[in-house]
């Protein structure tokens, strides 16, 4: 049934794509219309137009019929003051290795945007996974430029077919979050074009993406909002991009440099490209009005091409809570989960599995990455809920803190005069200054303010403070989780345990403190709203750190839900390679009590699996699987779904094994010096390319993933066509007892080259669904690009005549078929 639904969605999508594709082409007629409109704009209108306003908008010019344009973050759901479908994260989409599903994902997200009147979505993110430490790896599509490109193109085509402009980001070299505004990514020309730029190029040339967003970091010491070489030379020149080039939010660093070197639109507002500063530049001749006109034309012609001037963007026929979107989120989650270990066929659960313990920090939590990963879904399914619903014969015990917004539960919170809840004071300014306008008691901190929170307090630019005491019901750990936009911070006994005290969109932070049952702890929660609507939510729970031995020992299986979340992995910071020590301690203790341990890991990339794999009989990499993730994981555990996810990354045994380990961060001693630089010394040998060159055995190779069935490969054939393409065909057979999907991967290796080249590079793949005993023929067409490398003397890709090895297999280290071919 699931596969029928996905095929039906995709059939409709194919029709939409065929009808809508021409709408994204900037034709000479559209360019002429844009020129005429810009000619009618006053200088003041033009100077204001190239700076965003109200956070996520391009300003309207009503007298010319130029509409207000609404943008929304992000790649895995419509954010910004709305509930919406929370899809699996980007790296999960890549782990499906399914172009059709990526296209459906993009289209469903586009439909969600149309239901809310959003014109431009700020995604996908395609920065290459260079190291597991980068805090935003979860947003991206893995370590390989081909897989990243294929996934991104499909996603963009789907989204833009829905009538929503996609924005590919972050252009480019944004491969770490640590000190991202200041650290230069020093990348040689060949490495840029072979590894870090292909997804952007294909998005422009194949998917015809409407917008490109800059990165925060400099590349080769020049910020990408003012890099003439990258914007005008590569993006506009080599690739003939005619769309909008916008800055990331507060990623513009000068007026003249940005204006003269290709930036069209400064977001979220014109800090540097604003009328006051640009008038000075015009008066001194450092910027010309023609340069300003060109920016306005780029913006206007792109908006016209997408139909935004000629129709209402909100589609009232699409429900905001869309069951089709939920089904898409579930479909992606089902295919994204990677089965890493399954000793003794622990999975799927046999009929003997009747009593199950579910534990760990993510058992009842819906983990996401921080920043753009935080979407407010209408509904969610945790792993515990998923298992409860998947098989009614299974009796389940949950040993995990169940977070609640109810301030009167689990011991409870009390106002200063002893009433249940916390006492809130509201201030008519964002700094908690002066006397409170009013007070109100709350039994739950769960607010979404679209208007003033109380009389006498403005709708924006206000602050609030809640105070009281917390008396836990058990001795152990109290867990606090806060989500909100703009600033929030939490103090327990005057010690700050959570802080996100700056202007921002919705984020989520979590912290734990040791507590004693019956003891009173002072609580102070502070919040401010800077602009637009306000959101604040606090959940809490108490649990004992001592594992209940009898319950774990007597269970038929124990499922431990481990990993990171938005508090520990997200934007503007990097994260550790190791899982939190408390989790590793609990995993070890659970394994000693019960050998049937299954570990489910939530993370945006590789982690140190060494302390896990020796203790668990089964391990699943679930990424951040979105609102339906718990249901998908439960279906895989119980055998309703055969896992088909494959790693879009290489997972190292040790952090030191990663090819970038020695050069990932700038020298710490340089933190207070300028400039800060990270040299990409590994060159093109990132990911599996580097492991192959070094002869290092990874923990799990690129493309790896287990299934409940087995597959054989046979009959490799190759045919060279007159147009220079090569057609590779082979057969895949399901040799096991379960229906399942295999990801057949094709790698190309140059036998002799004038420059150092990787042993093999992914150049094709197909996901093939097979019934038990079924054989299918797979055909992959290779263009000359599959054999090329970037020549720094010619500043272009070249194919050197010679012998190449075509390898086909189940991962980069599991090659089943190979044969040489001569390319002249």
What are these regions (language model features)?
Residues 1-26:
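Bacterial Sec-dependent N-terminal signal peptides
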Residues 21-479, 483-792, 798-812, 822:
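Glycoside hydrolase catalytic-domain context in secreted enzymes
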Residues 815:
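Conserved glycine-rich phosphate/nucleotide-binding loop
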């Amino acid at each position: 049934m699931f596969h029928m639904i996905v095929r039906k969605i995709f059939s409709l999508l194919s029709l939409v794509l065929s009808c809508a594709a021409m709408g994204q082409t900037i034709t000479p007629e559209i360019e002429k219309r844009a020129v005429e409109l810009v000619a009618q704009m006053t200088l003041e209108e033009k100077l204001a137009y190239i700076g965003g306003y109200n956070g996520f908008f391009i300003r309207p010019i009503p007298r010319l019929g130029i509409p207000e344009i609404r943008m929304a973050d992000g790649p895995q759901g419509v954010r910004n003051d709305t509930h919406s479908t929370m899809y699996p994260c980007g790296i999960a989409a890549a782990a499906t290795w399914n172009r059709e599903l990526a296209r459906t994902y993009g289209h469903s997200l586009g439909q969600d945007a149309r239901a809310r009147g959003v014109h431009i979505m700020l995604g996908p993110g395609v920065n290459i996974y260079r190291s597991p430490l980068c805090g935003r790896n979860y947003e991206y599509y893995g370590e390989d430029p081909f897989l990243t490109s294929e996934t991104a193109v499909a996603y963009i085509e789907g989204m833009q077919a829905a009538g929503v402009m996609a924005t590919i980001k972050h252009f480019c070299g944004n491969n770490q979050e640590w000190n991202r505004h200041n650290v230069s990514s020093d990348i040689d020309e060949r490495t840029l074009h072979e590894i870090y730029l292909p997804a952007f190029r294909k998005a422009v040339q194949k998917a015809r993406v409407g917008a490109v967003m800059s990165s925060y970091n400099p590349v080769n010491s020049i910020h990408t909002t003012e890099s003439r070489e990258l914007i005008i030379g590569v993006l506009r020149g080599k690739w003939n991009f005619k769309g909008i080039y916008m800055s990331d939010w507060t990623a513009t660093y000068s007026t003249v440099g940005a204006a003269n070197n290709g930036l069209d639109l400064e977001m979220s507002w014109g800090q540097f490209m604003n009328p006051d500063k640009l008038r000075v530049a015009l008066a001194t001749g450092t910027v010309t009005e023609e340069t300003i006109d060109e920016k306005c034309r780029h913006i206007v012609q792109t908006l016209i091409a997408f139909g935004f001037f000629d129709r209402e963007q909100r589609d009232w026929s699409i429900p905001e809570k869309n069951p089709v979107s939920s089904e898409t989120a579930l479909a992606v989650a089902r295919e994204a989960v990677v089965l890493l270990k399954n000793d003794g066929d622990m999975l799927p659960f046999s009929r003997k599995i009747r009593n199950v313990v579910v534990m760990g920090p993510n058992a009842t939590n819906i983990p996401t990455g921080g920043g753009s990963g935080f979407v407010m879904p209408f509904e969610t399914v945790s792993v515990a809920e998923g298992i409860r619903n998947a098989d009614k014969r299974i009796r389940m015990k949950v040993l995990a803190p169940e977070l609640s917004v109810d301030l009167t539960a689990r011991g409870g919170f009390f106002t200063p005069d002893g009433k249940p809840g916390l006492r809130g004071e509201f201030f008519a300014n964002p700094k908690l200054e002066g006397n409170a306008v009013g007070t109100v008691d709350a039994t739950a901190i769960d607010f979404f303010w679209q208007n003033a929170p109380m009389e006498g307090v403005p709708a924006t630019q206000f602050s609030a403070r809640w105070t009281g005491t917390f008396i836990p019901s058990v001795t152990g750990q109290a867990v606090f989780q806060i989500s909100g936009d703009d600033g929030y911070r939490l103090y327990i006994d005057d010690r700050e345990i959570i802080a996100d005290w700056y202007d921002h969109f919705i984020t989520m932070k979590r912290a734990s403190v040791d507590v004693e049952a019956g003891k009173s702890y002072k609580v102070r929660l502070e919040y401010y709203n800077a602009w637009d609507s306000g959101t604040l939510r606090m959940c809490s729970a108490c649990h004992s750190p001592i594992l209940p031995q009898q319950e774990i020992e007597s269970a038929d299986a124990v499922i431990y839900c481990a990993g990171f979340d938005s508090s520990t992995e997200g934007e503007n910071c990097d994260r550790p390679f190791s899982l939190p020590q408390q989790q590793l301690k609990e995993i070890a203790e659970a394994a000693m009590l019960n050998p049937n341990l299954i570990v489910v890991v939530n993370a945006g990339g590789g982690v140190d699996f060494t302390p896990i794999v020796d203790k668990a009989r089964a391990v699943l990499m679930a990424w951040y699987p979105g609102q339906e993730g718990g249901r998908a994981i439960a279906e895989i555990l119980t055998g309703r779904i055969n896992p088909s996810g494959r790693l879009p990354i290489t997972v190292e045994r040790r952090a030191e094994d990663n090819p970038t380990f020695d050069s990932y961060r700038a020298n710490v001693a340089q933190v207070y010096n300028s400039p800060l630089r990270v040299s990409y010394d590994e060159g093109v040998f990132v990911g599996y390319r580097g492991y192959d060159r070094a002869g290092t055995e990874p923990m799990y190779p690129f493309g790896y993933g287990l299934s409940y069935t087995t597959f054989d490969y046979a009959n490799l054939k190759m045919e060279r066509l007159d147009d220079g393409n090569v057609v590779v065909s082979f057969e895949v057979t399901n040799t096991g007892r379960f229906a399942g999907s295999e990801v057949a991967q094709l790698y190309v290796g140059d036998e002799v080259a004038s420059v150092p080249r990787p042993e093999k590079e992914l150049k094709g793949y197909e996901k093939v669904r097979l019934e038990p005993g079924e054989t299918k023929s797979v055909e992959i067409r290779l263009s000359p690009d599959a054999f090329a490398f970037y020549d720094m003397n010619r500043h272009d890709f070249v194919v050197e005549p010679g012998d190449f090895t075509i390898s086909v297999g189940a991962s980069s280290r599991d090659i089943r078929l190979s044969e040489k071919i001569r390319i002249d």
